[in-house]
Each structure stands twice: as structure tokens, then as C-alpha cells.
Amino acid sequence: MRGKLLTLLKVAISLGLIAYLFTFKVDLGTVLRVLGQADLGRVALALGLYFGAIALGATKWQLLLRQQGIQVPLVALWRYTFEGLFFGNFLLPLVASDVVRGYDLARHTDRAAEAAISVLVDKLVGLLAFAAAAAAMTLTVALGWIPGGPALRGAVWVVWAAFGGFVVLFAALLSRRLRALVERLFRLPLLSRAAPLYRRLSEAIQPFRERPLALLQAFGISLAVLLVTNAVNWLLAEALGGGLPMRYIFLFNPMVAFAPILIPSVGGLGVNQGAYDLFYASLGGVVSSDFAISLSLLMQVLIYVSSLPGGVLWWRGQRRGGKPEGPAA
């Protein structure tokens, strides 16, 4: 029952945001005209780069697995990643993409706990890298290198507060001394319910405590993924006629990435469009709402198309009886 209610909530949020944006923010005809004039050559190049970002993400996952003594062929991880993306984008009300990745890996290795840990650490390191990039780029606003009104300057403090909280959380998960201190805080009545979740997260990340270089390398790969997706957004903006400076993409793209994580939706639909309009049109004032939402819709299509191979791979796997490929150690 709870799952059905969550599904209905996601559908309602996605449809509600789309209805709001196309009723009060943009004209549907204008958006369709902008999309209809897209340069398909640049769109194809952006799609190729996006596949590259996905491949980089799988490389980071393999790096983390090796630190746990798990050897999985990169080709197999690509498959699990694409299958996860497919289920996450098209069947999100039923199952999340990270759950699919972890399930596939667990079948491959017969090490369910380690598989779950690798997926969790992969996600945490990626979020930390994106938060760090967002915080670093907001300095350009604070220093006046990127012009912004009071709303954008206020957002700088929000980003830095969120980044600071993220760093403290990550440190509290890794450090045994901080862990002991935090566990004292969880004795308070208001925080006691969150104590089991914190302990599970901390125990999951402890195997990497003695491997800081691996975490640093994973952090670097996450930044590389962000750089590639920045280039993807710039190419799509150019495909729609240009006018969006790269520095604004570097500023806002890592922030946009958090929107579908914080707000439940169906594959990010509606939430992504609202985030693009908020950052690029409202806070940045660098493009119109029509252009921002057109860009977000084109990016949404790109995300959906790039995950389609996962459906094909899953179907082929089912025809073979769902047997995982490749050796594992």
C-alpha cells in the first residue's frame, strides 16, 4: 500500500509540475518551435558524450569494487549500469536504478552485502563531488565574476550550507571518533529514530576508511563525469540556437542534478524542467523560460534514449535465462 501511494505521489508531482510550467511559465507552441529547430548533428554528438559519461561512471564503480576484492569485468558493469538506468527511467515507480544495479551485481558475485556497499559508496562519492563542484562555482558569484541578483547571491549561502553539511556527514560516516560523537547525539529523543540508518551507512563505508586514495580517485572520476555532462548541456543549448554561456552551465548543472534526488518524480520528469527554469531563467536570468524548459526537455529525451540499451540488454539476459556473464572473484 505504501509503495502504491509513493507511486501516485511521484506521478502527481511530475504531472503537476509539467501542467504548472506549461500553464503559467511557457507557451507550448514556442517550446515546440524551439525544439523543432534543433541541430540534430549536435544532438547526436551530445548523445555520444552522454554515453561516455555513463561509461565513466561504470569505471568508478569498478574501482570501488576492486577495493573490496571484487573483480568484475567492465563490460558486465556497463550492462548492469544500463539496466539500472532503464528501470530507473521507465519503471521508477516500481524499482530504483541503484537497486537494479546492486541486484545484478549480487547475482554476479554472490556477495550481496558487498554489492550493496559498493553501490552506496558510489552514490555518496558522486553526490559529494557534485556538491563540491556546486560550492566551488558559487564562489564566482560571490566574487562577482558571474553577475547575479539578490536571489542568486542568497542561493550561494544555501549551497555552501548544504555542502558543509554533506562534508560533515561524510566525515562522520568515516571517522570513528566523530562516529562516537554523533551516536551520542542520536540518543536524543528527536534523533533516535534515525540512529539505525546512520549506523548502517557508517558500517557500509568503513571498509573504505583505510583506502583514502581510492575514494579520492572515485571523487576525481565523478568530477570528470560532471565535466562531460556540462559539455552535453552546452552542446544541446547550441543545438537549440545557443546563447547559454558555458560558465552558467558549470554553475547550475551540479545543482540541477540534486533536484530529482530531493523531489520524488517519475524519472525526473517535471522536476528537471522546473529546476532548469529556476536556475537558468529565474536565478541566472541568462535565458528565457521557453529556452530553459526546451533545453531541459531535450536533455530529458537524451536521458531516456541513452537508457534504452538497458532494456535490450535486460531482455537478452531474460532470453538466456537471466544468467550473469563473466567471471567474478
Task: Annotate the PLM regions.
Residues 82-99, 205:
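Short intracellular "coupling" helices and adjacent cytoplasmic loop segments at the cytosolic face
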Residues 1-82, 140-141, 145-260, 288, ...:
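Predominantly cytoplasmic-facing regulatory/coupling regions of multi-pass membrane proteins
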Residues 96-106, 266-283:
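Re-entrant/interfacial helical elements at transmembrane boundaries that shape
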Residues 85-93, 252-273:
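Transmembrane alpha-helix interface/packing and boundary motifs in multi-pass membrane proteins
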Residues 83, 87-91, 115-139, 294-309:
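Membrane-embedded alpha-helical segments of transport systems
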Residues 74-79, 93, 97-98, 108-124, ...:
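Membrane-interface alpha-helices at helix entry/exit sites of multi-pass transporters
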Residues 100-104, 116-119, 131, 220, ...:
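Hydrophobic alpha-helical membrane segments of integral membrane proteins
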Residues 66, 89, 107, 238-239, ...:
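Transmembrane helix-loop junction
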